[in-house]
Amino acid sequence: MKWLKRTAAAGMTAVMLFSCLPAAGAVQPGEELTRGETASILLEAATDYNADVTYGDILKGYPGGDLNEDGAVTRAQALVMLQRAFGGLPEPKGDNARSGYPAANFTDIPAWAQAELEDVLASGIVAGTSATTFSPDRKITKEQLELFLQRTYALEGSNLKDDFYATVNKEALDNSVIRPGYLGASAFYDLGAKVDEEIAGIIQERVDGGAKTEGEKKIVNFYRNILNIEARNAEGIAPIQPYLDAIDQAKTIEELMAVQNRVYEETGGTLFMGFGLNIDVKDNTAYTLLFDGITPSLGQGGYSTATPEQKAAYQTYVRTMLTLVGQSEAAASAAADTIWRVDAKIAAASLSNQELADVDKTYNIYTMEQLQAMFPRVDLEALFALTGLTQTNHIQVMDPGKLQAWAEIFDEGKTPDGLEILKTYARLYLAAGFGPALNEEFTEAGNAFSEAYMGSSGALSLEDSAAQYVQQVMSDYLGQAYVDRYFSAEAKADVEKMVQDILAVYRDRIETLDWMSETTKEKAIEKLDTVQINIGYPDDWDDTLKDVEILSAEQGGSFCDNLIAIQKGTNKLLAELQKTGVDENIWPMTTYTVNAGYLFTANSITFPAGILQEPFYDVDASYEENLGKVGYVIAHEITHAFDNNGAKYDENGNAVDWWTQEDYAAFQTLCEKVVKLYDGKESAPGITCNGALTLSENIADLGSVACLTEIESKRENPDYAALYTAMAEIWCSSYPRETRLYLAQADVHAPDKLRGSLVLQNFSEFYEAFDITEEDAMWLPPEERVVIW
């Protein structure tokens, strides 16, 4: 059985680095600039954009002609000079308009600068010292001026040597359009929308009379029940009303846990805590039990970094959801404040998304007795008995800090106020868990939250939303139909050859590493040679819903009933999986997923049919174009076997230390350089990359480009310019500023601009291909460049 609980892959985003800009004289980083130094830097920076500008045009003078070149310069004065240097700034379009800083929020722009700063503030390049303050009189430093220049180069997008990504993608970025209901525009989103349309077409064919098999009939029943909005609105919250009533009536933690047990038994869902399965990373032939509690909705960093607008959006969402399940406006408003406070406390004790991939931090084994001691007022044995799983005293807790924080909050339920907090969570989890299958007000609340918090616009149509639900839960039935219709044997053969070419070069690169001993190299090559390769689709097709009844409305079924049946069927499958052991040929994603992945515990790379098509792969494209696009993805996933997390697993997919102590120390030193390289680089004005959070993905990107650069070097007439241009193009993306703010603290991938630009700056071939020198903004000093694999 190749079934594995599938989760949506995190989306990818974008940033860029300009690490070294022209400077005048011997100005040191951190030092305040003089008027003369500022004018000299701006003159050199603007020459390619405003050829006739002079030093005097930029500096101008005081009455009487005194240039006061040694005088200090403020932030406001520096921006006036910048605008003079570039001859004005273009109006932001497309991505620049979406992600620029909203200067209209500034309340401290001096009257003298209002007119001269109007265009530069409207350009979106000016991030303030707070959400509403520009601090115009603060003295400007070299770093601040360089940031303003970097943002100006991105806005202009006309010089490859100053901003490679923005220039290559100028037209696409300026003309980018985000579809209603989507969070961004990119190759991933665009291809994903195309695949969604194709899957929707397959579904519609079954609905129009083409349903012959039991699986296809389940597709039709489920799809029609989702579309039956009249019945859903008429039913309202009736499916969860008994649980809401029981929550209201509970007077103790024990009575509240009885509600959770009832919810699990009758629907398969949980409210406060639950048991599950995970592949045992120390013995990947078997499963280990999992135990977890509440996870804050906004993640580990979502509360401490939230803007006032984001906090208000989340609290409005919570308030709306609670009123939809019967709470008064006053009670829901108070509860929204409480949820934020408690969520923030749990989040502060939680692991980051990067840490959650670190086996050293997540492989924490507890006994049932230890867990029972954490939750003394909960009968965990009774809760576990409902799962059908076989009990062992080997239970993994992936995030002990988060669980301990939740245990402390849960124990406060022995007080009236503490019990009310738990009741609020129970109501909210019922509303959020079942809401999408109930009346349309729940969906509208979710869409409103997405617009306010993420900056999205519009929503998917009911038909599109229904098709997406179907493809998420019925991939076993839809996957084969999709592959048969849309995936070619030629594409599979071409990609298989490219994978082998990349593996061969990767092997050569490991053999020539100067920081790794021969002992560790042998282990690394053994792991590389053992990588399992999944391309297109699996050899065998699962039917995980075989025993699940998906009843039509005529048979008494509904969207909510169908979801409950699927969840209960999933729980039953977990119990069966525990007995059968782990299938080594697991496919961790659907065949039509527009993504790719590396699975640590299987030492496998997976490239579904969904991503192996334009714009990532095109049978008619040049070798360099395919190498720079789908090749980037392939080599990236291979490198995950050797990133800071993958390096802790051996060739069999078990968490085993195969390094010498000296080699691992050298590897960690290189990882620290990668963190430093990416940390603080902007994805949009005022929004920076977290180098530690994105470390694993950045290692994979660097390894990918290193490998592909070497492959290109072996060709008779290497065309590095075409290769690197393709790389920048495939990561072209646009997001609202609100989405970028969220991704900056949650996504383990660096922003796309960095993935298609900063990574290239580590390779000498990039500089040679585009004649980039230390006089250009794209220049990265050799001592700052990092290549690991």
Spans of model-derived segments:
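Feature responds to low-complexity, polar/acidic, surface-exposed segments characteristic
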Residues: K2-A115, A127-K142, L149-E156, S517
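Second-shell loop/turn segments in exported
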Residues: V27-P29, G64-E69, A104-T107, T133-S135, ...
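Stable alpha-helical elements in mature extracytoplasmic
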Residues: T34-T38, T54-Y55, P63, T74-L82, ...
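Short, solvent-exposed loop/turn elements at domain surfaces
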Residues: T47-N50, A172-V177, L298, P615
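Active-site-surrounding "flap" and adjacent substrate/cofactor-binding loops of secreted or lumenal enzymes
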Residues: N159-D163, N169-A231
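Noncatalytic, helix-rich "gating/capping" subdomain that lines the substrate-entry/channel surface
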Residues: I203-K497, D501
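Intrinsically disordered, low-complexity linker/terminal regions across diverse proteins
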Residues: P400, Q471, S475, G479-W789
